[in-house]
């Protein structure tokens, strides 16, 4: 991991951009976090729209988390932002747009090719590097982003102890079987009137999760209408499980 820039934000948070091989990312840590008392880490997921476009939302989440005593980090997803375009990813994106415009079912192969084989190993590599930093310790949580990535990470990455998932992206049927293997505590957000999300599929997915502790928080409104207090509830969830 190579840090390429550093700045202190107004809220007493240290923001550092880094690269891990070809993977760009950002790390936020409370300035008060000493190496002698490493802080828990939350991995911030986001849609595959690029870090530059998502930065305002990501930094807002990071500042809120820092106020609660957490470090946070995020990485650029494969084929997004300034990263090189992968032919298989570009083809999957094209297939996804075509299927959605035609109202056709989005098959599992499209979503799997779009994100999972590349994104999950990269998140794990980032976690390896982040946990080597003296100011960061466990436990580790995962928050938001593409729900399929969160599900896969919850299954294959034992260092993730709790997750906040946003049921606002398409989930291939194959992920339902993986959802049954998830056992960590879950806090799931659902926008009830999300026009781009199959509400019943989201409810079925929640039912499929194998976690003994799981809660579903549904709010009226569309995809971008998540109320502020929903974030407060998610913060309390992480404080309960990571502190």
What are these regions (language model features)?
Residues 42-132:
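Serine-hydrolase catalytic machinery in alpha/beta-hydrolase-like enzymes
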Residues 192-197, 224-225:
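Acidic catalytic loop of the alpha/beta-hydrolase fold
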Residues 174, 195-201:
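Conserved alpha/beta-hydrolase "acid-adjacent" motif
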């Amino acid at each position: 991991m190579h840090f390429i820039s550093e700045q202190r934000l107004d809220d007493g948070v240290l923001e550092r951009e880094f690269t891990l091989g070809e993977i760009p990312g950002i790390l936020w840590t409370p300035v008060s976090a000493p190496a002698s008392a490493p802080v828990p880490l939350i991995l911030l997921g986001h849609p595959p729209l690029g870090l530059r476009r998502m930065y305002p939302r990501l930094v807002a989440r990071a500042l809120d988390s820092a106020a609660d005593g957490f470090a946070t980090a995020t990485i650029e997803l494969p084929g997004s932002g300034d990263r090189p375009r992968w032919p298989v990813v570009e083809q999957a994106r094209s297939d996804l747009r075509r299927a959605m415009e035609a109202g056709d079912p989005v098959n599992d192969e499209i979503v799997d090719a779009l994100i999972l084989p590349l994104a999950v190993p990269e998140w794990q590599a980032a976690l390896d590097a982040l946990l080597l930093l003296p100011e960061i310790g466990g436990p580790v949580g995962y928050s938001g982003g593409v729900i399929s990535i969160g599900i896969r990470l919850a299954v294959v990455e034992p260092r993730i102890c709790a997750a906040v998932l946003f049921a606002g992206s398409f989930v291939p049927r194959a992920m339902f079987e993986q959802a049954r293997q998830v056992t960590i505590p879950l806090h799931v957000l659902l926008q009830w009137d999300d026009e781009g999300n199959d509400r019943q599929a989201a409810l079925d997915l929640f039912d499929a999760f194998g976690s003994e502790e799981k809660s579903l928080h549904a709010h009226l409104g569309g995809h971008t209408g998540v109320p502020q207090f929903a974030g407060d509830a998610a913060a309390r969830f992480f404080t309960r499980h990571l502190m």
